[in-house]
C-alpha cells in the first residue's frame, strides 16, 4: 500500500509505500463437533475473510484521506491513469488504519475479533482493540 500524510512535518508528507503485515487476533468458543471441532475458526476461513475484506480492496493501492484536498487530487490523477486507489475519511496513520481494519473485520458475523496488530515496518507496529 502507498500513502502520504498531508501536513506532516517529516518525510511521510511524501508519497511512499509500506509492506504492511497484519496480525488478527480472534476469540470465541470452540466448535464442539464436526469438521471444525476444537477450533474457534478454521484459519483458511479467516484468511479468506481478511483477503476479501482488507487485502483485495487495499493491496497495491494508493490509500488516501478523502478529507485532504491534496490527497484527493493525487487520487483523482491516479484514477485517470487507471491506478488503484482506496479512499478513507481519515488521515492514513498506522493507528487509524489499524482501527479501520478492526472495524471492517468486526462486522463479519463469522469473526469475533479481539485485536488487530498492524506492522508498518519490521520493528514498528500499532495495535487496536476494543
Located regions from the model:
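Charge-rich, low-complexity N-terminal segments
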Residues: 1-130
